[in-house]
Amino acid sequence: MINTSGNTLIIDIRDELSFEYGHIDGAVNIPAEKLDKSDLPKDKKLLICCKSGLISDTEAEKLRELGYDAENLEGGYYGWLREKLSKEVVEDISQDAERSIQKKFRKEIWNRFTQSVNEYELIKPNDRIAVCISGGKDSMLMAKLIQMLHRHSKFPFEVKYLVMDPGYSPANREIIERNAKRLGIPITVFESDIFDSVYNVEKNPCYLCARMRRGHLYSKAQELGCNKIALGHHYDDVIETILMSMLYGGQIQTMMPKLNSTNFKGMQLIRPLYMVREDDIKRWRDYNGLRFIQCACKFTDTCTTCAPDSRTVSKRMEIKQLIAKLKLVNPQVEYNIFKSVENVMLNQVIAYKDDEG
């Protein structure tokens, strides 16, 4: 039996990854495919929640047929989030957010950020960097960190804080703009039609969207005179990518801390959060009372990605769960995965590929 308090139990039926990214206070996570196998209380009102209220409407109806007092949360988690943020005063918390980075999270976030920048030589004198902000927790923190570094840097470099609107709903775009304003980040927004282009693509629309977004970001950054784009991938993204490449791709490769563009001459991609852990990013977010949208595309608005067979989400979730299980046996497993691609013994592999194939 699920532990509950009060007369209403909020059940979030999204996948675990989405739930961890952000959820309604007090909600419990039971993915949709496990809902009918769960021991739910019949003496409580069940409020069923998904991303946008479409999948949860069907699940609530199924529960009512089984005798439960179940209702759908209209608009889902994102509807709740938009309403909550719309009622809040847009308060500038930039100084508090910076103070928390400098003091409470100095070791976990600031030191690891600067270590990444220095060890991999991500930022050099006279660089012009386009900090690419999707509106999520990772890119917003990255923007704040680079803003702080820029203010106190011993050498000159320039920064543009770039947000691409690929077709957000007005409400979702407003959330991104409000969070940027709260954190004191002066964003430049430009528009594209990427969401319309990939919406009817049946196979791997998320992969295609990511590729197109990066191309648009490179192009806009170059137009603004920048020589680098900064993306918000973190340490956990790196180790998950290593395992996903091995287990699903049959190859050994990693997510590089910096990468020269093959299509945009003179442009380079950098990842300043390369050594920052996701759990620490979440702690910083929660400590400062910030809420972000994980993905604000049309698939989110129509609950397409609520489906339990969402391949990209399920694969990454499988890898996260695998790493968590391995960590119970070997606490160093995450570090070992990260370091494995730095310790490749070429004379002890059957074959390898270089840039020439």
Predicted regions, residues:
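ATP-dependent adenylation/nucleotidyltransferase module used to activate substrates
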Residues: 89-244, 248-252, 256, 279-280, ...
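Catalytic subdomain that performs nucleotidyl-dependent activation
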Residues: 158-159, 229, 237-318, 322
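An accessory alpha-helical subdomain
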Residues: 318-345
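A short acidic, helix-capping loop that chelates divalent metal ions and anchors anionic groups
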Residues: 19, 81, 196-202, 303-305
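A structural preference for short, hydrophobic beta-strand core positions in alpha/beta folds
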Residues: 29, 72, 161, 189-191, ...
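Rhodanese-like catalytic fold shared by cysteine-dependent sulfurtransferases
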Residues: 1-9, 15-45, 51-101, 178
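Short, well-ordered beta-to-alpha junction loops that form the rim of enzyme active sites
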Residues: 14, 231-235, 342
